């Protein structure tokens, strides 16, 4: 049986691939081995309050807060970002079946009292399944951003950024809300940053797990935010096309789930495995349900994968489609790479090359499915017009298809 391995691009293009953002990283708490230690080397520290436990996290372990007095207190250089400077705060949050716990749960806050004086906070509201964050200097200068969370996810990757007067909220690497204040908000105060501890009498303590907490003295952009997006509890394969009779292996991100269930089960080698081999016979949307059965109340995550199945006997090699423009460096899957639109129609591939306007070759494909990311020798190329040349055989005859494309940035 032939198996197509689907390699997933998890990092950015060219020289940026695989880099972790360390510029202006002021504090980083991975919570690895159940330790509250600043791995940035900048010397922030903290204290664990209550009997906070550690559970499975997105990398190693995360701190679990049971909503009954568990909390963290953080001090040190990380507090310096909460002044008038630009900043970013990013972390992973896993919610649980919280039963009777309702109201506004304080995920984290740097706030002396229940007022708007020099305050920063991030809250989760269970009733509306909403994450929100506020910054305020006083009762006339403040702003709040908020977004609903995906009810089919257990882990959520949350990032807030402040750039001058603009305050933004990203969920799973996607901008969900952004507001502009009438002036830059000064957050300077001596209050420590507290995690999972209520500020106001109507607040509830946070009930869930936190992991991979980072503080930056800069406003990260969307690409930088996504370099830390581990996509927990997701199917990493992109929606794809395969030949009838072929198979592929499903790949899921690291997960803390105890049970897996694929539906439909037809063509799935093991419907209870995280990474089964799938052999579809018709276009199918596969749904993976990941179940947490630990003592935190449990949780369900769901993700889907669309697989189109093509019978090679129905393809016409005389009709090959190639786009005329693309935008490398944009969000993955949004016209960010260039290649043959229907590569399965090229059943006897010879070569596919791209040239700059001086005739220099900047890309040579290994097969019909290869795609160009807009780089040459690891460096992004300038916007402009490029030429392509596809050489292949169709019905036993050699064919040459040429044209131009525009690289946009």
Q: Where are the regions a protein language model picked out?
A:
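Extracytoplasmic low-complexity segments
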Residues: 14-69, 230-238, 246-247, 287-289, ...
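Extracellular glycan-recognition modules
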Residues: 23-26, 36, 40, 68-132, ...
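Flexible glycan-contacting loops in extracellular carbohydrate-active proteins
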Residues: 57, 179-209
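Short, aromatic/His-centered strand-loop micro-motif at the edge of beta-sheets
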Residues: 133-157
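Short tryptophan-centered beta-strand motifs in secreted/extracellular beta-sheet-rich domains
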Residues: 153-162, 169
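A short beta-strand segment in extracellular, disulfide-stabilized domains
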Residues: 242-255, 335-341
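Solvent-exposed segments in extracellular or luminal domains encompassing
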Residues: 272-287, 371
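Short loop/turn motifs at secondary-structure boundaries
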Residues: 311-409
């Amino acid at each position: 049986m032939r198996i197509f391995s689907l390699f997933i691009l998890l990092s950015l293009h060219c020289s940026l691939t695989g880099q972790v953002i360390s510029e202006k990283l002021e504090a980083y708490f991975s919570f690895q081995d159940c330790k509250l230690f600043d791995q940035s080397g900048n010397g922030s520290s903290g204290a664990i309050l209550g009997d906070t436990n550690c559970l499975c996290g997105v990398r190693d372990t995360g701190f679990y807060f049971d909503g009954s007095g568990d909390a963290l207190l953080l001090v040190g250089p990380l507090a310096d970002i909460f002044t008038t400077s630009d900043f970013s705060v990013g972390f992973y949050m896993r919610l649980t079946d919280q039963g009777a716990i309702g109201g506004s749960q304080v995920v984290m806050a740097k706030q002396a009292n229940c007022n708007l004086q020099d305050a920063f906070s991030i809250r989760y509201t269970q009733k509306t399944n909403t994450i929100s964050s506020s910054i305020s200097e006083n009762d006339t200068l403040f702003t709040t951003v908020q977004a609903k969370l995906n009810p089919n996810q257990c882990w959520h990757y949350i990032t807030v950024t402040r750039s001058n007067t603009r305050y933004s909220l990203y969920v799973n690497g996607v901008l969900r809300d952004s507001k502009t204040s009438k002036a830059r908000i000064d957050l300077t105060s001596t209050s420590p940053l507290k995690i999972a501890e209520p500020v106001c009498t109507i607040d509830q303590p946070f009930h869930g797990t936190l992991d991979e907490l980072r503080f930056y003295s800069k406003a990260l952009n969307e690409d930088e935010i996504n370099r830390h997006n581990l996509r927990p509890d997701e199917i990493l394969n992109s929606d794809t096309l395969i030949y009838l009779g072929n198979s592929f292996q499903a790949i899921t991100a690291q997960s803390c789930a105890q049970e897996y269930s694929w539906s439909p089960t037809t063509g799935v080698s093991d419907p209870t495995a995280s990474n089964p081999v799938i052999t579809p016979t018709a276009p199918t949307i596969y749904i993976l349900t990941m179940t947490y059965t630990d003592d935190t109340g449990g949780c369900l995550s769901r993700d889907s994968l669309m697989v189109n199945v093509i019978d090679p006997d129905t393809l016409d090699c005389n009709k090959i489609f190639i786009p005329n423009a693309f935008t490398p460096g944009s969000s993955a899957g949004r016209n960010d790479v260039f290649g043959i639109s229907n590569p399965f129609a090229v059943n006897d591939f010879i070569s596919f090359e791209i040239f700059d306007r001086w005739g220099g070759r900047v890309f040579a494909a290994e097969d019909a499915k290869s795609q160009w990311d807009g780089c040459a020798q690891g460096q992004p190329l300038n916007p402009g017009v490029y030429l392509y040349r596809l050489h292949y055989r169709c019905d036993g005859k050699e064919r040459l298809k040429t044209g131009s494309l525009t690289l946009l940035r």
